[in-house]
């Protein structure tokens, strides 16, 4: 979609709002401990948490970080988040892929579960597709993917699982690292509030 087709209003988030994720020192320490195989793709919603993660990673590994935005179209502000992602990535010279998906859920499936499954499948597909050359240099294949979930997200997920009567497996904590579809996946902000 051409940028001109997007709405000109932005959701109430900006790179400055990324300070809500954690203090700069805590974020910096988390990124210093984070050592993914490069190149790295960041799942980029355009919200404060993923903006903080993307900018910190792009600063630490210039030219080795790309962003993937999955547009579910489930929120009225979805197109505005696309615009936020486009602007942020352009300002920081981070390659961006915008993936539009149909997040309708199947009968008996929760909308959240359908959106999550589709989002993960889309992230895998986008990460594995070729990326445009940067400055005439071909971009190597993405080797790892980072998600901006943090401790508050983990608590929210646990409470949601409890409210749905989840068993022991459903109450397990979010992993900070795992492998899936040939990619190393990370949640480097999981220890941050």
Give the role of each language-model region.
Residues 2-193:
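Core alpha/beta nucleotide-donor-binding catalytic domains of modification enzymes
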């Amino acid at each position: 979609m051409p940028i001109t087709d997007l709405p000109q209003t932005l959701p109430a988030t900006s790179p400055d709002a990324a300070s809500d994720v954690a203090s700069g020192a805590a974020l910096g320490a988390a990124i210093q401990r984070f050592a993914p195989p490069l190149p790295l793709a960041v799942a980029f919603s355009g919200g404060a948490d993923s903006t903080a993660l993307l900018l910190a990673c792009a600063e630490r590994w210039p030219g080795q970080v790309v962003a993937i935005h999955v547009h579910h179209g489930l929120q009225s502000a979805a197109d505005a988040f696309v615009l936020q992602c486009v602007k942020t990535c352009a300002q920081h010279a981070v390659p961006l892929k915008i993936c539009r998906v149909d997040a309708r859920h199947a009968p008996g499936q929760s909308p959240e579960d359908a959106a999550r499954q589709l989002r993960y499948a889309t992230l895998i597909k986008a990460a594995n597709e070729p990326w445009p050359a940067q400055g005439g240099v071909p971009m190597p294949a993405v080797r790892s993917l980072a998600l901006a979930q943090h401790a508050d997200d983990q608590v929210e997920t646990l409470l949601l699982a409890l409210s749905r009567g989840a068993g022991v497996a459903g109450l397990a904590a979010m992993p900070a690292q795992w492998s899936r579809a040939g990619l190393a996946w990370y949640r480097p902000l999981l220890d941050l509030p």
